[in-house]
Swiss-Prot record:
Family from the record: Belongs to the WD repeat MET30/SCONB/SCON-2 family.
InterPro entries per UniProt: F-box-like_dom_sf (IPR036047), F-box_dom (IPR001810), G-protein_beta_WD-40_rep (IPR020472), SCF_subunit_WD-repeat (IPR051075), WD40/YVTN_repeat-like_dom_sf (IPR015943), WD40_repeat_CS (IPR019775), WD40_repeat_dom_sf (IPR036322), WD40_rpt (IPR001680)
F-box domain location: 164-210
Classification lineage: Eukaryota, Fungi, Dikarya, Ascomycota, Pezizomycotina
Subunit structure: Component of the SCF(sconB) E3 ubiquitin ligase complex.
GO process terms (BP): protein ubiquitination
SMART domains: FBOX, WD40
WD repeat segments: 342-379, 382-421, 423-459, 461-502, 556-599, 602-639, 642-673
Organism: Aspergillus terreus (strain NIH 2624 / FGSC A1156)
Pathway in which this enzyme or protein is active: Protein modification; protein ubiquitination
Disulfide bonds: none
Pfam families the UniProt entry points to: F-box-like, WD40
Protein's name in the database: Probable E3 ubiquitin ligase complex SCF subunit sconB
Amino acid sequence: MDSTQVSFKSIFGGTPEPTDEVDAEPDPTQHGPHSFNNVTTTSAKLADENVAPFLAKHIPEQYAPLGSRTGKPEDLSSANSKYCYRHRPDLKCRRQADEPSMDKLQRDLETLPQSDQQGIAHIWSLFSAAPAKHRKLILQGLMAQCCFPQLSFVSATVRDLIRIDFLTALPPEISFKILCYLDTTSLCKAAQVSRRWRALADDDVVWHRMCEQHIHRKCKKCGWGLPLLERKRLRESKREIELRATTWDISGPSPTVTSTGEQQREQSAAPESSSSGKRKQDTSDEETAVVKRQCSSLAPDSENDDAFFKKRYRPWKEVYKDRFKVGTNWKYGRCSTKIFKGHTNGVMCLQFEDNILATGSYDATIKIWDTETGEELRTLYGHESGIRCLQFDDTKLISGSMDRSLKVWNWRTGECISTYTGHRGGVIGLHFDATILASASVDKTVKIWNFEDKSTCLLRGHTDWVNAVRVDTTSRTVFSASDDCTVRLWDLDTKQCIRTFHGHVGQVQQVIPLPREFEFEEHDAECENDNVSTVSDDPGSPAPQTTFGVSSIEPASQSSMFGPSFDNGRPAPPRYIVTSALDSTIRLWETTTGRCLRTFFGHLEGVWALGADTLRIVSGAEDRMVKIWDPRTGKCERTFTGHSGPVTCIGLGDSRFATGSEDCEVRMYSFQS
């Protein structure tokens, strides 16, 4: 092996193919005036004699052609004491060589005559062995002799060479922190850079953060909000995701390829775990037994285990992708419609969960439907008059009727479990949360039913029919809307009205507390001087603030604004509520100050039905139209028509909403892609 091959291998890490001595003879006709063909054998030997001492001086541990050294090596600390963080001249360069570039360089070198190869190798050897100061001098001399085309070539080459893969060089937790600042478009582009970037950019740590930032809320940076994800999964995965951010192995496989992340989420349901990457969660003995049975049944076959977890769980990037499609469909009104027909009179109330839809009608029946097939599963008979309100969960359905009664049903079997009477007029509104049931009646009262201690109480104060109620068990308060054009906030502990909201000039039909995640910016508020609420005449009720803007109230002080009973750390009621009335308007209120922040205009007649979450408000009115609103800007984003009668009830979900009408039909609009 000659000196050319030795130099190329030691400098660039390549392995040049053997050179044929016969084919390597120089061809004077193929080279320009800058060729090394004029170098004689004597000159080559002289160059060797000049280069060898230089190499032996600066890299004695790699090059010692003059004989092995027996003495103490020279102290190189003085020559190489100043170095940048990316390169140390006294050590081997830590930057990895680019294989395609090195292959091309090798091929180009082999096209030259042997003497030219030897001369170039000498230059490379000198530069490789030189200390930092010498290298700068060599580079300055070379640059001074370069013409403009050569300088342009150097500039283009250096632009790529000085780039470093900082995400791979940094610890994973810092890389995740950086990626969490990117938007979705930038993340997708980052995933195309390399395999390691894809492993980082597609990891659950990054996309879980993206889901938290956008799902069920408006992102302050981009203004986008995505439909609500199942909160249980979001909550249960958060701690495990945070742990993954600190234990991520960059050399491991991409989470988009394997199901490791999904396995950890499933196995995290067990109270004990042998892996430090899996979170612990308290579960009941029965739940633990179920999990153990599942794990034991899957343990013998790892392939089945992977298939099971892949089937049950998806990476957070896939979740975001699905929610993004749904959000886009909401934005542009792309949806499918399904119509449910079966009632013989107007549909007055409805609710849907998963694939179950329950509807109540003036024909005194409740119907249970399968939303996937449109099939009527069963009809519940028992009320003697029209059904005005209903609500169901996994185990029961409670309905209220104009026959003055409340009934509790097993909606899966159609059996009526119990009947409650207590109102002197028809029941036209109800809402239950945990063990508290509130009912609204024609008799102008709100009745509270406590299933835990079997107690009841009446809340009096409205002067006309009470149309709707909402229970908030966190703050132990109840909202009520009435035909007396007011909305009241009641304290369940003191049984007193602590706030009355005035502003509507028509009968208030609906009141809905917005989720606590909802945020309203101060600059979005409208200054409406005539819409300041007042408080009731009950003693101890605090006076509301009448400032013409959204006050910046600290969370700790919000509770105290509702009276002395909230001073001891008791949670405050929901900060924002939405109401609708027969004055054809919808209003957004702040409960802490009692101010109307925004009024929504657009319906031609009274608004009977209302649905709301953190992203949108859906309303149905006497004008037979359904409108979707942005709660922050007040803009009507879309209007749906189709009903031939007034829209009387609305149910709102993450990717669909349902409307009921006096035309005896229920329409479900699905935005799921």
